UniProtKB/Swiss-Prot annotation:
The entry's keywords: Amino-acid biosynthesis, Histidine biosynthesis, Metal-binding, NAD, Oxidoreductase, Zinc
Catalytic activity field: L-histidinol + 2 NAD(+) + H2O = L-histidine + 2 NADH + 3 H(+)
Function text: Catalyzes the sequential NAD-dependent oxidations of L-histidinol to L-histidinaldehyde and then to L-histidine.
Family: Belongs to the histidinol dehydrogenase family.
Domain of life: Bacteria
Enzyme Commission number(s) from the entry: 1.1.1.23
Positions annotated to bind Zn(2+): Q265, H268, D367, H426
GO molecular function, one term: histidinol dehydrogenase activity
GO biological process, one term: L-histidine biosynthetic process
Matches recorded under Pfam families: Histidinol_dh
Protein name (database record): Histidinol dehydrogenase
Claim: Oxidoreductase is one of the keywords in the record: yes
Amino acid sequence: MTAPTAIRRLNAADPDFARHLDHLLSWESVSDDSVNQRVLDIIKAVRERGDAALVEFTQRFDGLQVASMADLILPRERLELALTRITVAQREALEKAAARVRSYHEKQKQDSWTYTEADGTVLGQKVTPLDRAGLYVPGGKASYPSSVLMNAIPAKVAGVTEVVMVVPTPRGEVNELVLAAACIAGVDRVFTIGGAQAVAALAYGTESVPQVDKVVGPGNIYVATAKRHVFGQVGIDMIAGPSEILVVCDGQTDPDWIAMDLFSQAEHDEDAQAILVSPDAEFLDKVAASIAKLLPTMERAEIINTSINGRGALIKVRDMQQAIEVANRIAPEHLELSVADPQAWLPQIRHAGAIFMGRHTSEALGDYCAGPNHVLPTSGTARFSSPLGVYDFQKRSSIIFCSEQGASELGRTASVLARGESLTAHARSAEYRIVDDQDQGQ
């Protein structure tokens, strides 16, 4: 039986509000020394023994009896088969979501550019896709096909040559929706491996698993810890914390809607965070009543209750202006502006992973099919981070072409600066290309 909900109530007018808010927002991962050491041992084993280590760890952690890596490779035909094993409605939903995600991300694609100066010097930027990206997908029955779309499609739009997906199949459990999503998203290769060992295989390569340039995708604490350790060998997307939603409401939205929006993140796990901010105290009471009324109807009521009681809050503010200030202080992963005129407040929002505008725009639409990416910065990192996008799978190279005149002119400036830093070879390298004015063009 679910315990009664006792969501925290805060008031921004209280003198110790800032301290209470900081305590509410604090979260530390549970990657302790033992987890860290186990991950390091796994990475070392994969680097040294390659496929053999992957087979051993898969047998140990996923409960599978496999003879070799050949048993852990899914051919393209298996992905296509998955499309026939899901319902027509599921396939249509995946295809519609994929089309919207693709359309949105195509607008993010950056192109190379150059400009030419008067003396013929050309400066610019060359935009190049990564050669190969690795996508980690959690396995088992609780896996998420939407994450496959959100991670793989931006990579393909960017022009990544090969997208390699790893997905564990604990006790042989294969999620057909995940494989169907991989087929629709254009994933090139799939290995049924998971955990820190899969991250290590992507980062360093084995006899069967190709080395990638970047590893993206969510996972448990072992996956997150492994991503930390391989960063530098490869790029990573981010180290994601628990899911978050912050709803700013003027008090005019149906309180049942708001309660369910809070549940939509709280149901992810016990550490997820759901916060409502409003200047209307009576409305906060109504939402609290809706939470109590609706919670018993939820399939994941225990998880929601633990999340709401442990990390949730209803925050009373002076007015909408202060609500926006609190939102910027929190820098949430998901921010709902459930107000009459969200466009009026949008310019003041500085820190948020995704902003959901208006009463009808539930966060769930963004999770699945609106188009923008649902891989978003958490734990306040929206202050300096962005959603996953096409730009995460592109890199930029500077282009510099100097004409004779340009090299001569720039050489004088470079010489002065280089000698000021006592780097004589730098200076002389530039000076060799300086020509007298009367010599230019001869």
